[in-house]
Amino acid sequence: METPGASASSLLLPAASRPPRKREAGEAGAATSKQRVLDEEEYIEGLQTVIQRDFFPDVEKLQAQKEYLEAEENGDLERMRQIAIKFGSALGKMSREPPPPYVTPATFETPEVHAGTGVVGNKPRPRGRGLEDGEAGEEEEKEPLPSLDVFLSRYTSEDNASFQEIMEVAKERSRARHAWLYQAEEEFEKRQKDNLELPSAEHQAIESSQASVETWKYKAKNSLMYYPEGVPDEEQLFKKPRQVVHKNTRFLRDPFSQALSRCQLQQAAALNAQHKQGKVGPDGKELIPQESPRVGGFGFVATPSPAPGVNESPMMTWGEVENTPLRVEGSETPYVDRTPGPAFKILEPGRRERLGLKMANEAAAKNRAKKQEALRRVTENLASLTPKGLSPAMSPALQRLVSRTASKYTDRALRASYTPSPARSTHLKTPASGLQTPTSTPAPGSATRTPLTQDPASITDNLLQLPARRKASDFF
């Protein structure tokens, strides 16, 4: 029977054309431990069984519960009965009842093992109790599967074996193509082996032999120019094989179960107190259930509370100020070096620094005085341009000139338009052209009055008072 991949190997390189060579250390170890080739389906099924057993042990139970619920939903009583017989009556219970609380031993006596109490390390009961005789016989005949690492080292699939053989053929072809690279290494190994053997008398008499012994080991693919090859781990051959016990990585029951109520804890405490009766502690004295443990004849005291009572004195008081507080300058406070390390202290400014600050303050004061004086002069000059600021000592001609000059830069009508003014009053002004003789004869008894001229307070006053259109009778 041909092994898997034999046809592929024969196509790549015939067996007769393969150059004989010495196997390397890693290949020799692999050749000694031959793996058993399994069918692809059988290999995957065995691998799945090992992984489910070691890493997912609850899958079988969950799958049975799912089938039981589906049979109950469909009304299949026969299927429900078969599942109940196969997996027992505990299938419907999702969580087991918690075991009785374990009492921690308080003495040095050997703990007693009572009959009927379960131990954590006990093996679970076999689930094949309700199986038929034929099925039980088949399970006994089956060989138990090893661990995952052992299974992978013992068995392999057809695809993996075929791939390994193809890789071996590729290596053989590479060595045949580069035979000159490995020929020197083979010659060196042969020469090294001959040197270790005891030569005959004829060879010892030959004078042309080398005086020195070759100690440098020649290798075609050295570690300098090629990647170093792995060294076979021979240390594990002398040690006991290690394995991972996967069941120890899981809890057999929930350690944080809420089923242990306060009542059960009280029962455990009472049971522990009963066990202490008549027992002797590590100090050689009898244990009293209601008494706290003692060390050297003295019991433990309660931890003092940081918050004192109402009638007790407080731990800290701030004191009272009975007089006017007085500020103490830093220079008057004596400096006490309480710590050996360096301390921070603000020093008083030096004489040079104080003199510089004084000169800077004086220069700033002078600049402020000059600025105020210049501002005052500008204000006086602006005020002298208005008629209100005319001095009575000035001549009338000079006063008229100043008034005429100031009136060029000010518009009274414009100023009155945006400046609120009190109730306007009619001012009487003398006409600039002098007195004029009226054209009409004044009525007897009426005094001659100066014509009234109203000074408009704003340029918008009398804007809508348009002059009336003259008639023809006004020209005759």
Curated annotation (Swiss-Prot):
Sites of the Glycyl lysine isopeptide (Lys-Gly) (interchain with G-Cter in SUMO2) crosslink: 142
Residue numbers bearing the Phosphothreonine modification: 3, 386
InterPro entries found in the cross-reference section: Nuclear_protein_DGCR14_ESS-2 (IPR019148)
Chain positions found as Phosphoserine: 292, 391, 395
Any one GO CC term of the record: nucleus
A biological process term (GO) from this entry: nervous system development
Main function: May be involved in pre-mRNA splicing.
Subunit: Identified in the spliceosome C complex. Interacts with FRA10AC1.
PANTHER family for this protein: ES-2 PROTEIN - RELATED, SPLICING FACTOR ESS-2 HOMOLOG
Family of the protein in this entry: Belongs to the ESS2 family.
Protein name, entry field: Splicing factor ESS-2 homolog
Lineage: Eukaryota, Metazoa, Chordata, Craniata, Vertebrata
